[in-house]
Curated annotation (Swiss-Prot):
Species name: Geobacter sulfurreducens (strain ATCC 51573 / DSM 12127 / PCA)
Record has NADP as a keyword: yes
Motif interval(s): ThyX motif: 79-89
Record-given protein name: Flavin-dependent thymidylate synthase
Family: Belongs to the thymidylate synthase ThyX family.
Name of the gene this protein is made from: thyX
This protein's pathway: Pyrimidine metabolism; dTTP biosynthesis
Annotated catalytic residues: R170
Subunit field text: Homotetramer.
InterPro entries assigned to the protein according to its UniProt record, in alphabetical order: Thymidylate_synthase_ThyX, Thymidylate_synthase_ThyX_sf
Upper classification of the organism: Bacteria, Pseudomonadati, Thermodesulfobacteriota, Desulfuromonadia, Geobacterales
């Protein structure tokens, strides 16, 4: 899995603070910008975050380049609707050679027997795909035999408000392992450019009781420590 923060709103925290300040100011935008110091930005962000005034977070957006995730993971990712996605097409991109890039779950690679079962199934899919393409079947139809394990590439843009929501769900221990790893790395990247906005971002247990109720992982203290100590 490879994840890069391709671009983001210039000075995202200042943009959010300016938008929030405007809501309560009678002066013009130019004057607000001149008066908004770095310490003011941090203080104002602290205040609006504590008040739950999250609509202003939508003024900051972040674009990620993601490679080497499975179609199983990308299907979960695109369920987050307040975002923009551009994904490598299996309709227009034809896999060449005897196989296709794929993601192997750790539970599968744990034993030789499981790996053999998995690779046998993957090779059967690859052989069927190649036979169909060689027989003149369009890639858009031959792709029907490709599995969820097939790797994909996708560019994703989300605003800060949606990212916080995304992290709350997908950084949770109960999230599927692949999208959890994706979400944790995305969080690490945005913390590097907007540390105040994303200071408390992560699974729901960081800021209150576990929202999973009876399905809790039971490791809230450990999870909190890991996210508080996250390196950026």
């Amino acid at each position: 899995m490879k994840i890069a923060l391709l671009q983001h709103t210039p000075d995202p925290e200042a943009a959010v603070a300016l938008a929030a300040r405007l809501c309560y100011a009678s002066v013009g935008i130019d004057e607000l910008r001149e008066k908004l110091s770095a310490s003011d930005v941090t203080a104002f962000l602290d205040k609006i975050m504590s008040l739950g005034h999250q609509s202003v977070l939508e003024h900051a957006s972040f674009t990620f380049g993601i490679e080497g995730i499975s179609r199983a993971a990308s299907h979960q990712l695109v369920r987050h609707r307040i975002a923009s996605y551009s994904q490598q097409s299996q309709r227009y991109v034809t896999f060449r050679g005897d196989g296709f890039p794929r993601v192997v779950p750790g539970s599968v690679s744990a034993t030789e027997k499981r790996r053999q079962v998995f690779e046998s199934a993957m090779q059967a899919c690859a052989d069927a795909y190649r036979a169909l393409v060689d027989d003149g079947v369009p890639a858009e139809d031959a792709r029907f035999v490709l599995p969820n394990a097939a790797e994909t590439k996708i560019i994703v843009t989300m605003n800060a408000r949606e990212l916080i929501h995304f992290f709350g769900l997908r950084c949770c221990e109960r999230a599927q392992w692949e999208i959890r790893a994706l979400a944790v790395e995305m969080l690490r990247l945005v913390k590097g450019v907007a540390p105040t906005i994303f200071r408390d971002a992560g699974p729901g247990c960081l800021t209150g009781p576990c929202p999973e109720g009876g399905m809790t992982c039971g490791k809230a203290a450990e999870v909190k420590r890991l996210f508080r100590e996250m390196s950026i």
